[in-house]
Structure formats: C-alpha cells, structure tokens
Amino acid sequence: EDVTLMGLSAGGHLALFTGFKNSGDFEFSCKAKIVPKAIINFFGIVDIEDNFNFLKENRPFLNYINIWIPPNKTIQEISQKYSPIEIVHKNVPKVVTVHGTEDRLVPYNHALMLDNVLKNRHLLITVDGGEHWRFSDEEHLAIKKQIDEFMVKEVWTK
C-alpha cells in the first residue's frame, strides 16, 4: 500500500505516466491493483511533442523521440496518448520533480508545466544551472533532504 514510483529521465516519464494512469479511472491492459502514494520524478518528459520540438530545434542529432513514433502515427497522436500532462486528474498521487534549469535533453519547462497543473500536490526542486543529471554532491544532498522532508510531511504521515 505504501508504494512510491521513481524514475529518471525516460524512467521519470514512465513513473508519471504509470502513476497517473493507475490512480485514475483509466482502463488499460497492465493496470496495477495498488495505487502509488507518490511519484518521484527526476527530469522526466511531461509532454512528448514539446520535448520532440525542443530537441528538433536544439539538438536534432539527439532527438531520440523519433524512434518512438511508428510510421503510421504522428507525433501529436503519440504525445496525446502517452504524455503525462494529458492525463492529469484530481486524484493523481503527490509528485516530487527534480529538474535542472540547464537541462539540454528534457527542457526545464516540463517541470514548470507539472508545477502549474498539480499545484499543492507537487514539490518542484529546481537545480539552478543543473543539467541532465549533472548535479554536485552538495546538490544531491540538498535534493535528498527535500525529498525526505516532503515524503514524511505529505505522504507517509497521511
């Protein structure tokens, strides 16, 4: 019952997507019986199309999202179906997002999108100048402390 999902980058996207789907009234083939109490998202993709366009413009040689799109689908179809931002609902678990402002693979605005939509169900931990998982030891310690405090106050005592 005390399940927390956590993921980094693509894993963050999957943790958000799975947690949002499993906590809502969605029917899908691999729905779990247990609803997670929280999701810890490290710089995960929130909007697939937005990330695709960001990479297309800024790092086209690293646009890994291209391989996610089957020939018979569009980026819009895939994004609408698999972007966590598209399936936010009132019963989503509490979410912690850790994101660096200088991330060049998943733009920081994805963290801001979640923060704007989830409001009091979300803790945004911003790493000023942080890249995609390029944080110092001191930043890691500060992140861990904030996550621990959030989990104790908002998740484990409820």
Predicted segment positions?
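Primarily recognizes the serine-hydrolase "nucleophile elbow" in alpha/beta-hydrolase
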Residues: 1-54
